[in-house]
């Protein structure tokens, strides 16, 4: 929370994971990544086996995410709460994107398990801003 406060940016995550450590990467303008490291291991491992929640500044995040569903192999649908939209590409189902009508962000949920990534993105209580 202290790191996010110093950034002065809105950052989303999937909440705490028991025994995990976290890294925050804000090197790219408009993109902030929260990486989950189970048991604090894997900090130098760049393989795609760790959960990552990315927050992208996107003025039209909702419209862009909805429109992405029209791309080849794209799938988009409204979240159960009615305010958000979820998108993923069938070729990369471990990367799921979500956005809300009233927020200038697109949020990416990456998990090594495609089912977990989709479930997390679709759960209105799971992906939250760090406060």
Task: Label each residue range with its predicted role.
Residues 70-131:
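A short, solvent-exposed beta-edge/loop patch
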Residues 1-94:
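Short, solvent-exposed recognition patches
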């Amino acid at each position: 929370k202290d790191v996010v406060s110093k950034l002065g940016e809105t950052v989303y995550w999937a909440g705490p994971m028991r025994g995990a450590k976290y890294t925050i990467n804000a090197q790219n303008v408009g993109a902030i990544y929260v990486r989950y490291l189970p048991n604090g291991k894997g900090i130098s491992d760049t393989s795609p086996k760790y959960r990552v929640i990315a927050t992208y500044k996107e003025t039209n995040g909702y419209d862009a995410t909805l429109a992405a569903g029209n791309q080849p192999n794209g799938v988009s649908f409204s979240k159960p709460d009615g305010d958000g939209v979820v998108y993923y590409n069938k070729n990369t189902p471990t990367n799921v994107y979500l956005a809300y009508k009233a927020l200038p962000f697109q949020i990416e949920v990456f998990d090594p398990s495609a089912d977990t990534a989709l479930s997390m993105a679709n759960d209105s209580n799971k992906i939250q801003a760090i406060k």
